[in-house]
Amino acid sequence: MKSLALNYVLQTARVCISGSRPPLHLLVMNNSIQTIPFTNLILAFIPAIVVVVIVWRWGIGYKRSIYALARMLIQLLLIGYFLVFIFKSDSSLIVIGVLAVMLFTASWIALHTKKIPRRELYLKSFCSILLGGGIILLLITQGVLNLSPWYLPSYVIPLAGIIFANAMNSVSLAVERLEAETERSVPYEQARIIALRASLIPITNTLLAVGIVSLPGMMTGQILSGVSPFIAARYQIMVMCMIFGSAGISAACFLAMVRSNFTTKEENI
């Protein structure tokens, strides 16, 4: 069973590097790879249940934790079935539609500020994530991986999710810190620098800790699937670079676009 998983992953890696069109069995899920039975998956909920009990005993509000766990379970099961449909469809239009939904949603979620209505900043949030995330996604899928077809769902959608999510978080941190600094009457140019630095703190810490404190999710998943750690490390390097790039570019673009929203006319002049 392990050899089947290794063969599947290595075949996928080879066709991506060579640029040739993968066979149909690589475009869809490989049913030969061992799955986790639901009865075994229940064991993974034991630590979560322990936390819920602790929260309940401490009177913090256990209902929210239960709701979060239930929602997580439903969302992941639904997205699993949805992705199976997308992978089997092999349609560029469906992939583009999914990317559009991800982009529009990320642009809206990124804006948590309460002082300025989201609608005033939404277009700028959208453009910044599109520029920062879209360019990185294009570079990775067509430059690094050289996917064929270019819309290969099993690669494009997961990579887009990673890129857009990190760009979204970076923009969210940037706007929150920018708002806090401008409320303290800090000049915009200085506030922008502080906001950009704050938006890059999480990913910078991750870069410093990767490989020493923790093994990232993608690398861990590949190693568990039987992939050589050297191959997994290359993929993880690619992922870390695209995360850092999308986060920094998106935040910088957003901070450059929203100057008029956080300054007076006199300051702009």
Where does each model-flagged region fall?
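N-terminal transmembrane hairpin
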Residues: N30-L147
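Juxtamembrane helix-boundary/capping and inter-helix hinge elements in multi-pass membrane proteins
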Residues: W58-G59, A180-E189, L224-F230
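Membrane-proximal helix-loop-helix units in multi-pass membrane proteins
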Residues: L138-P187
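Pore-lining and gate-forming transmembrane alpha-helices of multi-pass membrane transport proteins
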Residues: I157-G161, I231-A252
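Alpha-helical transmembrane segments of helical membrane proteins, especially in multi-pass transport
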Residues: N166-A180, E189-G221, S250, F254
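Hydrophobic alpha-helical transmembrane segments of membrane transport and translocation systems
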Residues: M242-I269
